[in-house]
Design a protein with these regions (language model features):
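Helix-loop-helix hairpin linking two adjacent transmembrane segments in secondary transporters
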Residues: 24, 30-90
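Helix-to-loop junctions at the C-terminal end of transmembrane segments
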Residues: 50, 166-179, 263-264
Length: 297
């Protein structure tokens, strides 16, 4: 719980900070691509440590995690040491005369609250889709597609690799199309791939489809952060993006649990219609956002 709390704070800070940089889609794409890369490499490293060679105890991987946490601490301190509250308030004065605190202004006062809540709900659904697919795809491939253990495990690796590559490559495409249009294209493509994954009962077709799903899902989180920075006044960026990222992160707990509970009763094949429905919901939420005007640097 404490680790999740700390990472949530750091996640919000990094997203808000980079979202205000020049070329934020590209830079955020690289930032979130490393998340996907970690999701690919960590299980492979942990499995190798436990099963190969000297077969180290399972808890040995926690030493690797501690080392990564030290690196995260060092980079965060270096980036934000001078970014005190006083510096932030001086650099981001209010653009109106309201006496509300910034969090209340972001969550309650229209029109800013509309953007904050739409982005938060969008990220809630997106993170739920990402983690539910990444977590349940192996079981689906084993039980429904009758895959071998190794090949089924590699489909999850392919999904996370798709997310990593998509965040890098599409991070350069998204700003040229505009965030609103780009995501309105990526999501229907993802839904089409989800239908192929669901309705074509071939192992390799499903494996390829889920990898490309990851590719088109990858840029959604960075694009939502960039959209929030363009639609909200600068003094609300940290409050609104921090809330949206934290609220969205709860999707990683809610939706995989819900899928698991339903799968327990109905079978893991329920994964596909649930994912398809969630994709439709977040597409609707995205289309409800106001028109995004080109950001003037």
């Amino acid at each position: 719980m404490l680790a999740g709390f700390g990472n949530g704070l750091a996640d919000a800070a990094w997203n808000a900070w980079i979202g205000n940089m020049a070329n934020p889609n590209e830079v955020l794409g690289f930032l979130h691509a490393f998340y996907g890369l970690g999701a690919v490499l960590s299980p492979l490293i942990a499995t190798t440590m436990i099963t190969k060679g000297s077969k180290l105890p399972w808890y040995t991987f926690y030493y690797v995690m501690i080392a990564m946490a030290v690196i995260e601490l060092a980079t965060s301190v270096t980036a934000f040491w001078r970014e005190t509250g006083a510096v932030f308030l001086a650099a981001n004065p209010r653009t109106n005369n309201t006496k509300d605190n910034r969090m209340k202004e972001a969550l309650v006062r229209l029109p800013n609250a509309r953007v904050t809540w739409l982005c938060a709900l969008f990220l809630l659904g997106y993170v739920g889709i990402e983690v539910a697919l990444g977590g349940w795809i192996v079981k689906f491939m084993l039980e429904v597609r009758d895959g071998e253990d190794f090949a089924s495990g590699m489909t999850a690796t392919g999904f996370w690799m798709g997310i990593t590559v998509g965040r890098i490559i599409l991070g350069f495409v998204t700003p040229r199309l505009g965030e609103k249009l780009a995501i309105a294209i990526y999501l229907p493509l993802t839904m089409a791939l989800e239908l192929i994954f669901w309705l074509v009962p071939q192992f390799y077709v499903s494996a390829v489809a889920v990898s490309f799903q990851g590719f088109f899902l990858g840029p959604l989180f960075p694009a939502a952060v960039v959209a929030a920075t363009k639609l909200l006044p600068r003094h609300l960026h940290v409050s609104a993006i921090g809330f949206a990222a934290a609220f969205g992160g709860s999707g990683a707990a809610i939706f995989p649990f819900a899928v698991g509970a339903i799968a327990q009763a109905k079978g893991v094949q329920v994964l596909q219609p649930i994912i398809l429905a969630l994709l439709g919901v977040i597409l609707g939420l995205w289309l409800c956002l106001p028109r995004i005007h080109k950001k003037q640097e």
